Amino acid sequence: MLVYLVRHGIADRRASTDQERGLASEGIAQNQSVVKKLYLQSPLIEKGFVSPFERAKQTAIDICLTFPDIEFEETALIIPDADPYDVLNLLEENQDQNVVLVSHNPVLSDLVSLLADGTIKSNRQIGPSNVLRMMMDIVAHGYGQLKYILEP
């Protein structure tokens, strides 16, 4: 299974709630840059999951403009403070497909630590508009291999 972890770009600080915060103009430019780099990697992506937060949905739209065959499903399992073990279960349920997750920190950083190192305590960090490609033969903590990181 291939898993692409995508953190949204830099978000605007002005909004009524955290969920409503959209991308700043710099975040939009970052997303466009990293999606172009992802396209050059010819990824095999069959399904997408996106956080219901506005900035993640905007990032998923940027991905869809380049990869129109990817259908995204909105899920609260990947909101910023979600439990990475719940995300691991989501991946296990979809292990017959290569997926992209468009989400936030800290859940993405915790997830990459869990998949690659077997613990969320390893303190890996994912920057804005970064894309990580992970490969897993078995969907379980500690079995993920980080193949590459794309930055804007």
Residue ranges of model-derived segments:
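Glycine-rich phosphate-binding loop signature in dinucleotide/nucleotide-binding domains
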Residues: 41-44, 93-97
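Short Pro/Gly-enriched beta-strand edge/turn motifs at strand-loop
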Residues: 73, 113-118
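Domain-level recognition of soluble alpha/beta enzyme cores
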Residues: 119-145
